[in-house]
């Protein structure tokens, strides 16, 4: 199978086209310009708000003008993650895609099907006048991945739809009618620089090969967190050796489970062989623990040039102890929906910043507002006990399920008629923009669906090609039969 043969042709044409347009979160200028040019080319009413959200309107098929207006919605930014051995500039370089069996993936980077496939689907509908539908508004939001900025900034009256179809879900055959709310917590330690004594061996301890994944959709899988595993070894080593912590870095994005982390440490030269032995023993133990969910986990120890400075011992001790104690993963399962995570927390990243600051970013999610605040307060308490300054982001609301939704009834009936099986109606632990849309447009009738994606927010991201056709057929049928 070659890319030019992929079906539906229009969707994959536009997906490949937008893969040529850099669109990192908060750097969406090029894709916004692309969308404006697209609207002008097709002579469609197009507008952009102050945040950068784009709305393109398409009139109804003749005879369908009295149908309810449907908003098709996707976000235009993408998570930019790459493997360490891959050279790629997300600000300038296109995403290189390739076919692997029935899957489409990128070459060592995130694919951007989250949510590029939704964007491409909307463009294909806007460009094809043979598709039957009532009035359509295509909403393209900015910066979903790092703060839901576009959804927060959306003003009342920018769109005028009655129904909203969010195209940002990742399991074909599943219709989502609810999502978790979330909040970000940031802890900062201030440290002093101290001298590393002469005669100390300096080395880098690195963890890589973890699958990572989405901190909402994949948190229940029990995959390893590179920050937690690295910290576990460093804590062990610090108790055995006179260890200086010179550098620490792990994870990147608040909504991704950390895949890689490293630290540079210094210990007495006489202990370097024992340290390597300890790491080998530790690696064997942890690799056995994660053999099923993270079979490619690796620990690497490499010699480093001598570092003259390190984090002061007191701060380093408090940092390691606090990260060790900080919760990560599933905290509670839903009592209403079997198999749904209710509350979780993600220890996302550990970074050294200018001004002698070590910054730890975490994110908390819950379908219950009080539980979301409870788990955030738990994280805050742990870090404050360790002497860190803690701050919270604004947070965002969840989307309460409406099992009596009219558009849900249409989508369920359509799926059964097209494919002979029942669609699964679900809520999702990941955050969607839908909760914020309801704040501004409380009368909206909404569902979320999409083709099958795996490994989103990581270079393992891939899209199951046959599900794109099913998603497309289902969406067009909903637009055709949608009730007036």
Language-model features: locations:
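Acidic/His- and Gly-rich active-site-bordering loop/insert found
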Residues: 2-103
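Zn-dependent metallopeptidase/amidohydrolase metal-coordination segment
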Residues: 7-11, 342-355, 363, 419-478
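Midchain, well-structured core segments that form catalytic/ion-binding scaffolds
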Residues: 22, 102-105, 145, 152-365
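Active-site metal-coordination/substrate-binding segment of hydrolases
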Residues: 64-146, 151-162, 202, 313-316, ...
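Short, conserved charged micro-motifs
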Residues: 65-66, 269-278, 369-375
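Acidic, glycine-rich active-site loops and adjacent beta-strand->loop/helix elements
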Residues: 76-78, 139-147, 169-172, 211, ...
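His/Asp/Glu-rich mid-to-C-terminal helical/loop segments that flank catalytic regions of hydrolases
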Residues: 157, 223-240, 269-272, 317-324, ...
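Substrate-recognition/cap regions that form aromatic- and gly/pro-loop-enriched pockets
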Residues: 340-430
């Amino acid at each position: 199978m070659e890319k030019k043969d992929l079906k539906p042709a229009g969707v994959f044409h536009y997906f490949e086209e937008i893969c040529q347009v850099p669109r990192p979160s908060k750097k969406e200028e090029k894709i916004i310009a692309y969308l404006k040019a697209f609207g002008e080319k097709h002579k469609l009413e197009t507008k952009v708000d102050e945040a950068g959200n784009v709305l393109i309107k398409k009139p109804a098929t003749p005879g369908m003008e009295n149908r309810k207006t449907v908003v098709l919605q996707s976000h235009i930014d993408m998570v930019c993650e790459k493997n360490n051995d891959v050279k790629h500039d997300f600000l300038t370089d296109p995403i290189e895609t390739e076919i692997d069996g029935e899957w489409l993936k990128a070459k060592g980077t995130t694919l951007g099907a989250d949510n590029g496939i939704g964007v491409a689907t909307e463009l294909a509908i806007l460009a094809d006048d043979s598709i039957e539908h009532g009035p359509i508004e295509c909403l393209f939001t900015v910066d979903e991945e790092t703060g839901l900025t576009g959804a927060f900034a959306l003003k009342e009256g920018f769109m005028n739809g009655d129904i909203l179809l969010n195209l940002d879900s990742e399991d074909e055959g599943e219709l989502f009618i609810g999502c978790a709310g979330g909040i970000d917590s940031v802890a900062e330690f201030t440290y002093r620089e101290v001298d590393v004594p002469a005669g100390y061996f300096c080395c880098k301890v690195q963890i890589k090969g973890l699958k990572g994944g989405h901190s909402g959709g994949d948190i229940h899988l029990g995959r390893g967190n590179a920050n937690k595993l690295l910290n576990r070894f460093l804590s062990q080593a610090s108790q055995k050796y006179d260890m200086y912590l010179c550098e620490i870095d792990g994870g990147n994005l608040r909504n991704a489970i950390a895949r890689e982390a490293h630290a540079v440490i210094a210990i007495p030269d006489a202990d370097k062989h024992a340290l390597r032995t300890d790491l080998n023993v530790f690696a064997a133990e942890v690799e056995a623990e994660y053999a099923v969910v993270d079979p490619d986990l690796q620990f690497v120890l490499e010699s480093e040039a001598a570092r003259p400075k390190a984090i002061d011992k007191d701060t380093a001790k408090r940092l390691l102890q606090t990260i060790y104690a900080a919760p990560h993963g599933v905290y509670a399962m839903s009592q209403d929906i079997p198999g749904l995570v209710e509350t979780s927390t993600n220890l996302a990243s550990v970074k050294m910043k200018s001004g002698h600051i070590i910054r730890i970013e975490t994110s908390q999610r819950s379908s219950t507002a009080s539980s979301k605040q409870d788990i955030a307060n738990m994280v805050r308490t742990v870090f404050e006990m360790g002497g860190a300054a803690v701050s919270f982001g604004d947070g965002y609301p969840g989307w309460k399920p409406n099992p009596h939704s009219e558009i849900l009834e249409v989508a369920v009936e359509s799926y059964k008629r097209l494919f002979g099986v029942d669609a699964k109606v679900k809520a999702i632990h990941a955050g969607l923009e839908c909760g914020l849309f309801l704040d501004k447009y409380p009368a909206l009738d909404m569902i979320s669906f999409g083709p099958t994606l795996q490994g989103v927010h990581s270079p393992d991201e891939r899209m199951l090609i046959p599900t794109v056709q099913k998603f497309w057929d289902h969406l067009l049928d909903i637009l055709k039969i949608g009730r007036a």
